[in-house]
């Protein structure tokens, strides 16, 4: 019993303890659940407060935008009235001018007839003059022969005279010697006479002495006799005296003997002297005879000299007379030549004046046509504005399932309003730029003077004569106006922006198609101006590959002229890519009325990354984009006025650099933060371009063109900043740059990606600080979508040149995917270069074409961006964009920093196209991303995308037709892509360099950086993809394709005429040169 009791008590105890534990566990669970519920309530309250604040801000912004819209509409109405009045006055003036011109034309015709008659008379006179010239030449030849004979005779006379002078010189020398000898003889004779006188005096003295001595002898003899007598007496004494006397006598004898000897000697000397005198006299007489003979010879020679001199004088007189006659004949001939040249010069001047007047008349007519077309475009825009407001209501309906998507749709509406306002501002600016008769152009004329007008006229002429002079004009403008060309390139990019913007103003949905058709219409008007644009390149390739090649070769410069008159082919293609980016972006904006970009668009218009975020926001309304594409197809029917208007805008924008700069500065004041960052990036890019390309500055504005829908003024201002800061900042804009023609673009991609890292990081940090609602890359899609969004983020980072920031796993994932995509694309690109389109299956061909497009882009240093977009599989872009707009908390700082191109390529080709278009506008890469992204669900869809991307100009209908497995169209597309990648500047990028570029892109080390450089290239493809979307949405218009083919045929005919006219011009020039030579 006790044991049973114990067991029961223990069991009850255990039951009690277990119940207590369960109760405590339940309490703990309840407490934890309570705490969790409270925490959730607190989080929800905070989220609701946050969302309410955001909603309040959005409401305020919408109200402000509505007010701005009303003010802009009022301004628009006033401007429209003023424009109508001005156009009425201008039409009247034009009619008056036309009447006056017709009258002047009749006068000029009469004058030309009279001048033709005068020319005939002059020709007859020329013939007579030629005959006279021939006769004169004969006479001159005869006179020359006579002159030669006279010269020969003269030379003989001169030789004889020279010999005579020599003889005379020798004779005069001898005569001088004779005179000297004669003078010496005279001196010797005088000295001899003096010596004779002296000797005679001495002889007299000696004789006197002899006489005295004789007398003394006589005395002595008498004395001796006396002495002898005395001696005899005195013998002794006398003997002594005798001895003494004898001694004296001996002495005296000795003296006598001496004197006698002296006398003999003197006599001998005198005889000798006399003999010498006789010899001297004989020689003197001989010399006198010689002198007489010489004098006679001299007289004879002088007489001969006189005769020769007289003969020479007569000959010289004859020669002078002959020379005077020759001079007179030459003067007459020169006078005749001068008269003939003057007559020819006057005739040529008259002809040139007439041609210039005719050209002016043609230019005025073309300008009138353009103004008329612009007025029609403006009217169409005014009509389309009403539809735009109605369409916004339908398009702004959010299709996103999440609350964030709803918020994104609301914000997209606000951004659409902002975008519409900004586009209205841009449109007004474009109206000012493009209306030649509006007050805006008058203001510009005041500011920039006649120089801008001349440039505008030149631009119009260039558009009219694109086939004839576009290449030359582009080169000449680049050479003569380097500064203007830079500004023009910026302005042309701006123009492209303005084109996209103006079309956006009329209907954001319709802008892309209208621009494409406008380009086609411009092809009609301008011969093939837009025919040469990348879109038209695709059209040409669809029509005929050979014709396309010819046109591309002929119109490389033309492409440049249309997009950027001053840009060369490389820059032209970048500009075309930028145009395509703009159009795609505009279409995407238009299609995605979600323009949730507004704030990021304001701050990041210049930053490609921010553009992509804005595009991501736009992506939220993919369904709306489809509806917008449908509307855009409808608008394609009216492309001509818009395109012409855009071209007009481009020409005016090129010319109106100053005003565009002012407007850009104004826009920059609003967007100064991001625009400065962009300007730094673009300036860095410009520096890299300067290192790699001679025309890097021009390519930079092309990069700027990517944000056309934002505001061309802002881009131009940024481009200014870029140009100014190009030396300092050389890095970040390389992403946008598409160095189509130069291998330097390849290095640019690398260098710029490297150099952009620091600056772009700064820009990203700045973007974070700016509180811009960057469409973050956070995607609320499936895990695959999230990874794709990460890839997109990394791709965006790669575009923005922030490799360091994107070293994350996401970035690595993107790099891996990019490298794979790059490998595939590079292989496709190689196949493109080889044009091995037949090897590809239908599906593979479509993919290869997509890859080819991307590969071509890669060849231009932008392959990697497209590859980065390949990485992104089709995701719920709507969810992505919806969350990206509002999921700021979920978004990483890196993603915030990277306003990277959100190129979301969905498997659905059309949604891809929409996304790509929106992204291409921002970064120009997404279109390639579409082409490079994962295979669409159906190969037929791929084919559709490819053919339509290529056939954007050809027509959406053609794209719809190409939806089937059309291998020929695919081959054409591949050829077009190959040609397009190669043609931008065949000199700039040889095939080897392109292969090297493909290899570099193939390297896994560079994928992220290279993706940066690709965006521009992708934009044209995206625009084509937009066209494809529109074609898919609407049935193809056969008429549109026929129009395109007709335009292509016309352009071919014009080119053939141009080629035919060139040899004629050459022949005419050669004939003129021959005539001048004959004269």
UniProtKB/Swiss-Prot annotation:
Region listing for Disordered, in residue ranges: 1052-1079
Classification of source organism: Eukaryota, Metazoa, Chordata, Craniata, Vertebrata
Record flagged with keyword Iron: no
Coiled coil residues, start to end: 59-210, 236-384
Keywords: Coiled coil
Membrane-crossing segments per the record: none
InterPro entries registered for this protein in UniProt: CCDC73
Domain of life: Eukaryota
Pfam families: CCDC73
Compositional bias of kind Basic and acidic residues: 1061-1079
Gene source species: Homo sapiens (Human)
The name this protein goes by in its record: Coiled-coil domain-containing protein 73
């Amino acid at each position: 019993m006790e044991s049973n009791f114990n067991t029961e008590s223990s069991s009850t105890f255990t039951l009690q303890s277990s119940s207590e534990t369960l109760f405590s566990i339940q309490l703990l669970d309840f407490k934890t659940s309570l705490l969790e519920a409270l925490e959730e309530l607190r989080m929800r309250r905070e989220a609701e407060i946050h969302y309410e604040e955001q909603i309040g801000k959005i409401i305020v912004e919408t109200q402000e935008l509505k007010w701005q819209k009303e003010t802009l509409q009022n301004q628009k109405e006033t401007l429209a009235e003023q424009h109508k009045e001005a156009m009425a006055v201008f039409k009247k003036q034009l009619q008056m001018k036309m009447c006056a011109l017709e009258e002047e034309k009749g006068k000029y015709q009469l004058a030309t007839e009279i001048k033709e008659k005068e020319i005939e008379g002059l020709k007859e006179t020329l013939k007579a003059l030629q005959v006279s010239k021939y006769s004169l030449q004969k006479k001159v030849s005869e006179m020359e022969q006579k002159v030669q004979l006279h010269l020969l005779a003269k030379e003989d006379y001169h030789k004889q005279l020279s010999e005579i002078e020599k003889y005379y010189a020798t004779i005069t020398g001898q005569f001088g010697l004779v005179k000297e000898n004669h003078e010496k003889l005279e001196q010797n004779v005088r000295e001899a006479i003096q010596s004779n006188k002296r000797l005679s005096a001495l002889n007299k003295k000696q004789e006197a002495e002899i006489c005295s001595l004789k007398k003394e002898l006589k005395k002595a003899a008498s004395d001796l006799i006396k002495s002898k007598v005395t001696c005899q007496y005195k013998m002794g004494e006398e003997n002594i005296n005798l001895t003494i006397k004898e001694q004296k006598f001996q002495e005296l004898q000795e003296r006598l003997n001496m004197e006698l000897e002296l006398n003999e000697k003197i006599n001998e000397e005198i005889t000798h002297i006399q003999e010498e005198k006789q010899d001297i006299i004989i020689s003197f007489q001989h010399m006198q005879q010689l002198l007489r003979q010489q004098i006679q010879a001299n007289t004879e020679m002088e007489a001969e000299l006189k005769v020769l001199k007289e003969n020479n004088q007569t000959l010289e007189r004859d020669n002078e007379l002959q020379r005077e006659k020759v001079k007179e004949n030459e003067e007459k001939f020169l006078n005749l030549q001068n008269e003939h040249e003057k007559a020819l010069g006057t005739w040529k001047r008259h002809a040139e004046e007439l041609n210039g007047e005719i050209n002016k008349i043609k230019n005025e007519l073309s300008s009138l046509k353009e103004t008329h077309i612009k007025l029609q475009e403006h009217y169409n825009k005014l009509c389309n504005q009403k539809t735009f407001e109605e369409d916004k209501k339908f398009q702004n309906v959010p299709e996103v399932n999440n609350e964030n998507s709803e918020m994104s749709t609301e914000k997209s509406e606000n951004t659409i309003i902002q975008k519409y306002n900004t586009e209205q501002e841009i449109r007004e600016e474009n109206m000012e730029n493009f209306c030649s008769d509006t007050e805006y152009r008058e203001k510009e004329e005041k500011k920039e003077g006649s120089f801008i007008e001349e440039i505008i006229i030149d631009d119009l002429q260039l558009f009219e004569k694109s086939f004839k002079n576009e290449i030359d004009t582009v080169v000449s403008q680049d050479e003569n106006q380097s500064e203007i060309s830079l500004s023009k390139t910026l302005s042309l990019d701006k123009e492209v922006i303005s084109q996209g913007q103006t079309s956006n103003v009329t209907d954001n949905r319709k802008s892309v198609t209208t621009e494409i058709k406008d380009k086609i219409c411009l092809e009609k008007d301008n011969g093939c101006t837009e025919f040469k644009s990348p879109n038209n390149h695709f059209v040409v390739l669809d029509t005929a590959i050979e014709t396309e090649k010819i046109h591309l070769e002929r119109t490389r410069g033309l492409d440049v002229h249309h997009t950027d008159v001053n840009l060369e082919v490389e820059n032209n293609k970048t500009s075309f890519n930028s145009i395509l980016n703009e159009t795609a972006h505009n279409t995407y904006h238009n299609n995605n009325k979600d323009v949730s970009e507004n704030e990021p668009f304001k701050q990041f218009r210049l930053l490609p990354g921010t553009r992509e975020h804005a595009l991501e926001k736009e992506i939220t309304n993919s369904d709306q984009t489809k509806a917008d594409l449908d509307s855009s197809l409808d608008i394609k029917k009216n492309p001509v006025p818009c395109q012409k208007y855009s071209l007009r805008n481009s020409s005016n924008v090129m010319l109106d650099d100053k005003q565009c700069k002012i407007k850009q500065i104004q826009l920059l004041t609003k967007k100064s933060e991001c625009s400065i960052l962009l300007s730094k990036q673009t300036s860095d890019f410009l520096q890299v371009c300067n290192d790699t390309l001679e025309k890097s500055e021009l390519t930079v504005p092309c990069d700027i063109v990517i944000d056309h829908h934002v505001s061309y003024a802002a881009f131009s201002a940024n481009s200014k900043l870029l140009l100014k800061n190009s030396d300092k900042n050389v890095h970040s804009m390389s992403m946008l740059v598409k160095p189509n023609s130069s291998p330097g673009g390849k290095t640019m991609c690398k260098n710029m990606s490297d150099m952009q890292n620091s600056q772009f990081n700064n820009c990203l940090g700045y973007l974070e600080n700016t509180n811009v609602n960057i469409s973050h890359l956070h995607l609320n899609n499936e895990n695959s979508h999230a990874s794709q969004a990460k890839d997109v983020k990394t791709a965006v980072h790669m575009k923005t040149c922030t490799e360091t920031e994107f070293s994350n796993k996401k970035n690595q994932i993107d790099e891996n995917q990019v490298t794979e995509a790059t490998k595939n694309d590079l292989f496709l690109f190689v196949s493109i270069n080889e044009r091995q389109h037949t090897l590809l299956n239908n599906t593979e061909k479509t993919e290869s074409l997509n890859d080819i497009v991307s590969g071509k882009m890669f060849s231009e240093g932008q392959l990697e961006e497209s590859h980065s977009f390949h990485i992104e599989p089709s995701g719920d872009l709507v969810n992505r964009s919806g969350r990206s707009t509002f999921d700021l908390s979920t978004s990483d700082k890196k993603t915030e920093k990277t306003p990277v191109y959100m190129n979301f390529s969905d498997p659905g080709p059309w949604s891809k196209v929409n996304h790509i278009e929106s992204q291409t506008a921002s970064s120009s890469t997404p279109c390639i991303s579409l082409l490079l992204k994962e295979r669409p669900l159906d190969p037929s869809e791929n084919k559709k995308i490819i053919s339509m991307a290529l056939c954007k100009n050809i027509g959406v209908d053609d794209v719809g037709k190409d939806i089937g497995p059309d291998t020929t169209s695919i081959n054409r597309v591949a050829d077009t892509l190959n040609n397009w990648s190669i043609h931008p500047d065949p000199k700039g990028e040889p095939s080897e360099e392109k292969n090297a570029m493909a290899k570099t892109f193939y390297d896994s080390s560079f994928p992220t950086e290279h993706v940066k450089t690709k965006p521009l290239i992708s934009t044209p493809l995206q625009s084509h993809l937009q066209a494809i979307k529109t074609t898919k949405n609407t049935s193809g218009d056969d008429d549109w394709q026929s129009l395109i083919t007709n335009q292509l045929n016309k352009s071919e005919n014009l080119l053939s005429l141009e080629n035919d006219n060139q040899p004629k011009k050459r022949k005419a020039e050669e004939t003129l040169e021959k005539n001048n030579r004959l004269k």
